[in-house]
Amino acid sequence: MILSWKDVLSQEKKKKYFINIIRFLKKERLKKIIYPDQKDIFNAFFLTSFNDIKVVILGQDPYFSKNQAHGLSFSVPKHVTIPPSLKNIYKELNTDFKKEHIFHHGCLESWANQGVFLLNSILTVESGKPKSHSNIGWNIFTDKVISVINLYKNSVVFLFWGSNAQKKSHLINRKNHYILKAAHPSPLSAYRGFFGCKHFSLTNKILLKTKKKPINWFLI
């Protein structure tokens, strides 16, 4: 069965809480700087079709500094300096595959185009104020997103880095999907279990086992 995001989420966008989120953002943008730009909030959904999802990497909320957030977890536009967490992701990627690849930018759109759904739990943030939009209803929406992936997809690999992401584990049926957990790649926690997790090679092994094309993580 081929499903689109519209098929599985159209009713959600009609619900009162979702309408309230959109109204709130419209008002906030009149007086404050909100990231990402309105056009980029749902980029993860535009770049990875529901039918193509093979992997989910769950982030927290968007980057809260100018020009960084563009709707994909951990990713930044090509012209922006690579943030510390993403540098650590690249470091683990090289270690995992025993490479010394030089990454010239932090845009992960090529991952998204290969079926890696780069979702944040919270989809917007006020400039300079991390987690400022954590209570406006986004968690209801992203819980629903994870739930429909769990319900309608098979053998998806969920990469949950850090305790916030791991709280979503209860939404997933482990009989039908795979969950890989590690510490968050932030410099504050990467040495507590993110480095050495080998999630990228493990993910590809699972994809091969389930007869899916592995991700070319170095295609950036």
UniProtKB/Swiss-Prot annotation:
Name a single GO biological process: base-excision repair, AP site formation via deaminated base removal
One GO MF annotation is: uracil DNA N-glycosylase activity
The cellular location(s) given in this protein's UniProt record come to: Cytoplasm
Q: Output the InterPro entries linked to this UniProt entry.
A: UDG_fam1 (IPR002043), Ura-DNA_Glyclase_AS (IPR018085), Uracil-DNA_glycosylase-like (IPR005122), Uracil-DNA_glycosylase-like_sf (IPR036895)
Q: Where is the active site?
A: 61
Q: Which residues form a coiled coil?
A: none
**Which CDD domains did the record assign?**
UDG-F1-like
Classify the source by domain of life: Bacteria
Q: Name one GO cellular component term.
A: cytoplasm
Reaction(s) this enzyme catalyzes, per UniProt: Hydrolyzes single-stranded DNA or mismatched double-stranded DNA and polynucleotides, releasing free uracil
**Gene3D superfamilies recorded for this chain?**
Uracil-DNA glycosylase-like domain
User: Keyword Membrane on this protein?
Assistant: no
Its family remark reads:
Belongs to the uracil-DNA glycosylase (UDG) superfamily. UNG family.
Q: Which HAMAP family match?
A: UDG (MF_00148)
Q: What does this protein do?
A: Excises uracil residues from the DNA which can arise as a result of misincorporation of dUMP residues by DNA polymerase or due to deamination of cytosine.
Protein name according to UniProt? Uracil-DNA glycosylase
- In its UniProt entry, the species of origin is given as Buchnera aphidicola subsp. Acyrthosiphon pisum (strain APS)
